[in-house]
Amino acid sequence: MTGIVKTDQIQGAGSSTVTIPSGTALNVTTVSGTPTFSGASTFSSDVTLPSINGGQIGGRRNVFINGAMQVFQRSTSESSLGGSTGYFTADRIRFKPNSTAGRFTSTKDSSAPNGFANSLKLDCTTADTSIGAGEYFFLSQKIEGQDLQHFAKGTSDAKPFTVSFYVKGNASATYTCELYDEDNTRQISKTFSVTTNWTRVELLFPADTTGAFDNDNNSSMTFAIWLHAGTNYTSGTLNSSSWASATAANRVSSSNTSFFDSTDRTFFLTGLQLETSSIVTPFEHRTFGEELTLCRRYYQRYGYPFTAFRNSTTYSWVDATIWFLCLPFDADDVVGSHALPVEMRAIPTATMTDAYIRLQNNGQNYNSGNTLQVNGSSTSHASLHIDTSAGLNATNVISFTFNNSNGYYDLSAEL
């Protein structure tokens, strides 16, 4: 018997399996449940799969930089932190303490979940159990507005923010993760748990149709993990369901653990990811070279701890690397310049270990009295004016080196 059978529903018997002969054309509006298609299946119209279409398909999903904690240009270990704000170890990770007596060590650690090589470890070294109302400590990453435009925040097409990361600690803890819109003073927070094992935290923050991000190279949004907070930030109701105008008391959970409650306390972090999506996707790994290039937009260091001076005979440190050449314009002033490998976010500030500067001129080494006087750098070139007490030969090119393995100069355009 041949012909056409029209039906509104096909239902399998028993196992609920329906077999359609090969070559049969079906006009299907909805397939529910968990269907399995075997063989070669051709779909002649659009197919909507929420678990795929709910997020970006393809690479470059992750907005965060150095999420796998690969790059540590400044240092792989710093102690006695907690008294000032800044970037100290992992690139793009900023520590922001306020009025706390707690202190900690930050290190690059080899403990990591499967598929990762590194994590950022914080280790409390001085406890602070008497928490003042205005105290806080959080780690953060700031993001340029021009890198957030695809979230369409402040429009009717606004997209959700999905944050994920891996954490562990010495004991159970509860901390608060916050997204803070700096352009419009809006925020939203959610809590997460830490155990003694590596776990992946997955947090979905809803879209915000109010307040667009500025399209520029300034900081528009801060991602923060609050590890310590006083009642000025914990006494309200945690703003966790939708974006709202920032109220200090609603930013941190009242159940937030204090990282400074004991010198036994540790906190490990890696696998940071931020994507425009309604689902969580696997971490997007990038090569070390890619990650280093992204980090160098904000910070570049030359010298320690990456100084690789080698003596061909003893393999001990020698002052053999010429970092740049200088042109003198009088007997005690020189200017050196070199192109940067990556254009920086803004005109950078410059710092230098003045005590370790060595100027070499006409066969003479000048090891003291040298200071960085003027930074004339641009986003694409370093231009450094060195003042010296030495009497230089103003007709010769002068080389800039260091007289110690701890010598360095750096350029910072951090947010």
State the predicted function of each range.
Residues 1-62, 275-283:
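Intrinsic low-complexity, repeat-rich intrinsically disordered segments enriched
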Residues 13-17, 56, 77-84, 196, ...:
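Surface-exposed ligand/attachment interfaces on beta-rich extracellular proteins
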Residues 50-74, 211-215, 226-307, 411-414:
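Extracellular polysaccharide-targeting segments
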Residues 54, 128-129, 149-153, 187-194, ...:
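Beta-strand-rich interaction surfaces with strong enrichment in secreted/lumenal proteins
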Residues 59-137:
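Aromatic (Trp/Tyr/Phe) and Gly/Pro-enriched flexible surface segments
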Residues 69, 137-177, 203-211, 271-273, ...:
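Extra-cytoplasmic beta-strand recognition segments
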Residues 174, 186, 303-415:
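Phosphate/adenylate-binding glycine loop and adjacent helical scaffold
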Residues 184-213:
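Extracellular carbohydrate recognition and processing domains
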